[in-house]
Amino acid sequence: MIDDILAAMDRGELIPYLGPDVLALAGASAPPSSPEALVAQLTAAATVPHKIRNNLTAAAQFIENFKHRKTIVAVMTKAFAVDAEPSDFHKWLAARPKLPLLVNAWYDDLLQKALKVRDNWGIAQGASQSEHFGEWVQYYRPDGSNIPGVERIQDGSGAKAPADAPEETLKWSTLLYQPLGGVSPGGNFIVSDSDYVEVLTEIDIQTPIPEAVQSIRRGKSFLFVGCRFANQLERSFARQIMKRSSDRHWAVLPGTPTKNEERFLAEQNIARIDMSVEDFVAKLTAGAAGSPELASIA
């Protein structure tokens, strides 16, 4: 299985999809590496009802309603704007020569830092409708400068335009897609119930998915690392982001999967790799070091 993954990577046909658990590889200075750790920081900054203290999206919504959206942004920024270095795995991924698309389904900027070694790349981040009404995605150059989105004339119906890509972004050789937003460069966060409702209302018809992502994913295989698929949000985002890709994928999923995870893996034709993220990364990078095609970059 490792050989198949490396072969797909060597052909430029693999899309790494990273979840929060990958941050455990970055050491003690890393930002929150789970929804549970993040909601603990949110509820330490603002009082929320006991029954939702462990629910990230509900706690964020309560704070947004009874404090202000700016409070959410401030707490999220404080949680993720930490002086953490990319892990060796982040750096290893960023050094792959054929890397058309990476997905980071969390709010950190470690992949951005690792990608600084590359040329001709950029960032697409999901954006909250409460802060960027009518715009699903914010685009950024490696220096953090924002690229204006495609202008559209709204017809007054309230319908939101699709996430068309500015011409400049279609020429990048590598795109980092952060569907939930990210702390850097723009402090975009899809985190509250209302944030998710806006996206999920449209995601089945792909409106919030960046145009470049829809194009690049065709015929590609996804490799999920540091992700779980236990709840509907996790499954919905993964399902819609990988739509119309190839019919072969992999997921590093240690431990006993839930019934919902088992169904999702079968539905999406995702082969489960039952090992820890640490062990998988060690095998993957060791396999690359032993591959004639990848030896020079391992």
Outline where the language-model segments fall.
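SIR2/sirtuin NAD+-dependent deacylase catalytic core
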Residues: M1-A298
